[in-house]
Amino acid sequence: MTKPEIREPRAERYNPHAIEPKWQARWEQEGLYTFHEDPSKTKHYALTMFPYPSGNLHIGHWYANVAPDAHARWMRMRGYNVFFPMGFDAFGLPAENAAIKHGLNPATWTSSNIEHMLGQFKRMGTMIDWSRSLATCDPEYYRWNQWFFTEFFRRGLAYKKDGLVNWCPKDQTVLANEQVVDGRCERCGTPVERRNLSQWYLKITDYAEELLDFRDTDMPERVRAMQTNWIGKSVGAEITFDTPAGPETVFTTRPDTLMGATFLVLAPEHPKVPALTTPEQAEAVRAYVEAAGRKTDVERQQELGEKTGVFTGSYATHPVTGHQIPIWVADYVLMTYGTGSIMAVPAHDERDFDFARKFGLEIREVIRPEGGEPLDTTQAPYVGEGVIVNSGEFDGLPGGKASIAPIIARLEALGVAKPKTTYRLRDWLVSRQRYWGTPIPIVYCPDHGAQPVPADQLPVKLPENVEFMPTGQSPLKLDREWMRATCPVCGGPAERDTDTMDTFVDSSWYMYRYLSPHDDQHPFDPAHANLLPVDLYTGGIEHAILHLLYSRFWTKVMRDMGLTVQNEPFARLRNQGIILGEDGEKMSKSRGNVVDPDDLVREYGADTVRTYLMFIAPWELGGPWDPSGINGPAKWLSRVWALYFDEKAAGPEEKIGEADLRYAVHSTLKKVGADYERMSFNTIIAALMELTNTLVKAKRSPVFGTPAWEEALDIFNRMLAPVAPHIAEEIWRERGGTESVHLQAWPAVDEAAATRDTVTIGVQVSGKIRGEVQISKTATAEEALAAARAHPDVAKFTEGKQTIKEIYVPGRIINIVVK
């Protein structure tokens, strides 16, 4: 026989500090949120981007997590088998820098932070399954980073090359292009330098075209646009010009303007620059190339002043006319786009026009507005598509896209051009010269070169006793013993690669590892692949062209490796906004506008903080923190408590019937369900608050104590559970529930009860609202106006006055105009 549960006496007033720790401990003890696969249920994999273990969850973490938690709880109550894991993105520079500052090993600092943040997450009251938790700094995790790297290497997707890279002088490490924002390090804000280094890259460009296909993932339009722009597909032609240093191929999206090309421009880094530079120009070119090398690509593209450049002294031969055109070097041309050289058409390109005006170069019109007169393109370029002119056999053809194919075909027949598609996307630079990251699993043999570490020797663990002060070279180079290795081909001595991987490698596939976080045979157990893809992924839009693009690339490689059948890691992505400081600025310690959620929980309880963060603003937009705003949700939850447990409701008796109450309950239930579908959390809270007002009135009406009243309390309790899980659980158990409210089914909408044959509309007198009337939805204009005239609050403003006009907008408004 089951022992009856011993309950403590119920508190008369709502006390979250007594309720919340009790239920958090109980849920954990009972394993309420532990995921178990159940083929009889439809799976729902819900995932929120995992945090960096900085030491404390800030209010932004709460904002990012509580709304998706409510959504996951709602899905579970609807009968879905919800998988909702969480872990920690634990490698990276902040841990290394903090460890340097405090004289700790990064592993010690990170582990302590994870332990603290885990407790904070639990006090948030989430339904996270912590049995699947992971930390990317654990060797059992980064072993698979290394395994993937070796597999990418074998497939030709990981390679090493020399080249100009972005260098952060403060963090003393290389940055990927995506980590440079406005010429500065994304993390620390330091101006970025350019250095020539040998680095490892992943060949994301092999998947550029496929990454432009979003058919298998539901992403916000803004994210799709950002990724599309970053990939930067351009369709055009490669055209070859003869030069003294051999043929030079340029890429253009406007082959229709070829006859207007009056000079070539090469990037300062272009390998032909030395050979094309004449002795007379050698010193000027050398100085210019050196100066350009001190600028980042972003700075070169964004400079608003006069164009700069230098003449090489050499000329190219125009492939059609045979004319000699000068070859220049200018830093507005990038080696990383196209071929690193352009044909300049100053009459029809703004940058080329500015350059030609600056240096007195020829400007030749070859495109004219359709039906228009010749333009003075020496004063301003014409960049429209127009009609081709001054171009021999091409004259009269439409400019732009319409003529690309026939013009390329003709140039191809002449042997000077071919069709070409290019992408702005560059391969992903993954080498980092810091300690706290995944060691790159490559050894270097004098006889066999770079060789991947065999799978049975993984993980290559980080050495523990290393001096990791930033010096510009990897700290791993300081551990000579760790560097010693054996060549897997010949068994001879070899040396380890001493760089570590970009931490975005860690987060590119972590959503798969949750399926079996302790599996030592596979990155993830294929037996659990039925949980894929992630059904709902949530996080900040700031990751649009970093993490979100890299994870899509990683999934496509995994598919080609036979590890998954998915084309995309996420079926649906939604982004939350940002909670700003009270001053409307981004929260930061230096501004003194940081809100500590732990302080709020100590004062108000987790349920109040949860509901306020869902109520404060549309979730996808965010907004400024209002310190007084949290009092509203706090008072609301106290009213909810009183609704269930106070004997009487103060106030005059209300006239609410069963049909009225059931309409309020079921119409709210229907609205809340629709709002969960569109993730409109602020309107969910607003609807529940409004229903609370109705229930408080109903408690003072004849409907109190009836079956309709009991149904209302039951449904409201279950609607409350996803947003305020602790108070909802306490109410449920106090009302006799033997199982958790979080194991209950979401209530079914009674469509008949949720629909009314009548409608309540406002009545205006001379444009001002004076009352409301309830009329049939099919009422005629005369019936509606008669009801309005009879309303006592309306009659006070119409009696003794002349009626000028009466207006009835069916179902919307009545207006009686008097004088």
Curated annotation (Swiss-Prot):
What HAMAP family is this protein classified in?
Answer: Leu_tRNA_synth_B (MF_00049_B)
* Motif placement: 'HIGH' region: 51-61
What family is it from? Belongs to the class-I aminoacyl-tRNA synthetase family.
GO CC terms in record: cytosol
Where does it localize?
Answer: Cytoplasm
Query: Which CDD domains does the entry link to?
Result: Anticodon_Ia_Leu_BEm, LeuRS_core
The EC number(s) given in the record are 6.1.1.4
Q: Name one GO biological process term.
A: leucyl-tRNA aminoacylation
Instruction: Please give the Pfam families that the UniProt record associates with this protein.
Output: Anticodon_1 (PF08264), tRNA-synt_1 (PF00133), tRNA-synt_1_2 (PF13603)
Q: Which UniProt keywords apply?
A: Aminoacyl-tRNA synthetase, ATP-binding, Cytoplasm, Ligase, Nucleotide-binding, Protein biosynthesis
One GO MF term on file is:
aminoacyl-tRNA deacylase activity
- Output the InterPro entries linked to this UniProt entry: aa-tRNA-synth_Ia, Leu-tRNA-ligase, Leu_tRNA-synth_edit, M/V/L/I-tRNA-synth_anticd-bd, Rossmann-like_a/b/a_fold, tRNAsynth_Ia_anticodon-bd, Val/Leu/Ile-tRNA-synth_edit
Q: Where is this motif: 'KMSKS' region?
A: 586-590
Where is it mainly found?
cytoplasm
- Presence of keyword tRNA-binding: no
Q: Which domain of life is it from?
A: Bacteria
Q: Which residues bind ATP?
A: 589
Q: Which reaction does it catalyse?
A: tRNA(Leu) + L-leucine + ATP = L-leucyl-tRNA(Leu) + AMP + diphosphate
Protein name (record)? Leucine--tRNA ligase
